[in-house]
C-alpha cells in the first residue's frame, strides 16, 4: 500500500560540517590523506630515479631541494604527525588494559606509543646515517 503523504525532509546545506568543531577537525584529519598521496608519489618517483642510474638520482635530489617541494614535504610531515596523534589517542579506547582489576587510563598507552615511535625513528636514522 502506498501513501500520498510527503515525508518531511530536513534541509541540509553542503556546509553543515563547518558549524561544529568536532566535524571540522574530523574533516581536517581525513584531509591528511591528500599530503600522504603526495609523499607516496615522491617516493615512487625516487624509486624510479634510483632504478635509472646516477644522473636520474641526482635529478631527484635536485627536485627534493626545490623550496616548494621542501614546503610541501613539511606540510606532509605535519599532516602525518596529526594523523599519528589522533590514532594514538584512539588506541586506548580500542584496547581495554586491566591491571590489578582496574582499567588503565589512556595516558600511559599514548605515551608508550610515542616512546616506541621515537625509539624506532632514532634507530632507523642511526642505521641510515651511520651503518
From Swiss-Prot:
<dbReference type="GO" id="GO:0005886">
    <property type="term" value="C:plasma membrane"/>
</dbReference>
<dbReference type="GO" id="GO:0045283">
    <property type="term" value="C:fumarate reductase complex"/>
</dbReference>
<keyword id="KW-0472">Membrane</keyword>
<protein>
    <recommendedName>
        <fullName>Fumarate reductase subunit C</fullName>
    </recommendedName>
</protein>
<keyword id="KW-0812">Transmembrane</keyword>
<keyword id="KW-0997">Cell inner membrane</keyword>
<dbReference type="InterPro" id="IPR003510">
    <property type="entry name" value="Fumarate_red_C"/>
</dbReference>
<feature type="transmembrane region" description="Helical">
    <location>
        <begin position="61"/>
        <end position="81"/>
    </location>
</feature>
<comment type="subunit">
    <text>Part of an enzyme complex containing four subunits: a flavoprotein (FrdA), an iron-sulfur protein (FrdB), and two hydrophobic anchor proteins (FrdC and FrdD).</text>
</comment>
<dbReference type="InterPro" id="IPR034804">
    <property type="entry name" value="SQR/QFR_C/D"/>
</dbReference>
<comment type="similarity">
    <text>Belongs to the FrdC family.</text>
</comment>
<comment type="function">
    <text>Two distinct, membrane-bound, FAD-containing enzymes are responsible for the catalysis of fumarate and succinate interconversion; fumarate reductase is used in anaerobic growth, and succinate dehydrogenase is used in aerobic growth. Anchors the catalytic components of the fumarate reductase complex to the cell inner membrane, binds quinones.</text>
</comment>
<dbReference type="Pfam" id="PF02300">
    <property type="entry name" value="Fumarate_red_C"/>
</dbReference>
<keyword id="KW-1003">Cell membrane</keyword>
<keyword id="KW-1133">Transmembrane helix</keyword>
<feature type="transmembrane region" description="Helical">
    <location>
        <begin position="30"/>
        <end position="50"/>
    </location>
</feature>
<feature type="transmembrane region" description="Helical">
    <location>
        <begin position="110"/>
        <end position="130"/>
    </location>
</feature>
<dbReference type="GO" id="GO:0000104">
    <property type="term" value="F:succinate dehydrogenase activity"/>
</dbReference>
Amino acid at each position: 500500500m502506498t501513501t500520498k503523504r510527503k515525508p518531511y525532509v530536513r534541509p541540509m546545506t553542503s556546509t553543515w560540517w563547518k558549524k561544529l568543531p568536532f566535524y571540522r577537525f574530523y574533516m581536517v584529519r581525513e584531509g591528511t590523506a591528500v599530503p600522504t598521496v603526495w609523499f607516496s608519489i615522491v617516493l615512487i618517483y625516487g624509486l624510479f630515479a634510483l632504478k635509472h642510474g646516477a644522473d636520474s638520482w641526482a635529478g631527484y635530489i635536485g627536485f627534493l631541494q626545490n623550496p616548494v617541494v621542501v614546503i610541501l614535504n613539511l606540510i606532509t610531515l605535519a599532516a602525518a604527525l596529526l594523523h599519528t596523534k589522533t590514532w594514538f589517542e584512539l588506541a586506548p579506547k580500542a584496547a581495554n588494559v586491566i591491571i590489578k582489576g582496574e582499567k588503565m587510563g589512556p595516558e600511559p598507552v599514548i605515551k608508550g606509543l610515542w616512546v616506541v615511535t621515537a625509539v624506532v625513528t632514532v634507530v632507523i636514522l642511526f642505521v641510515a646515517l651511520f651503518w
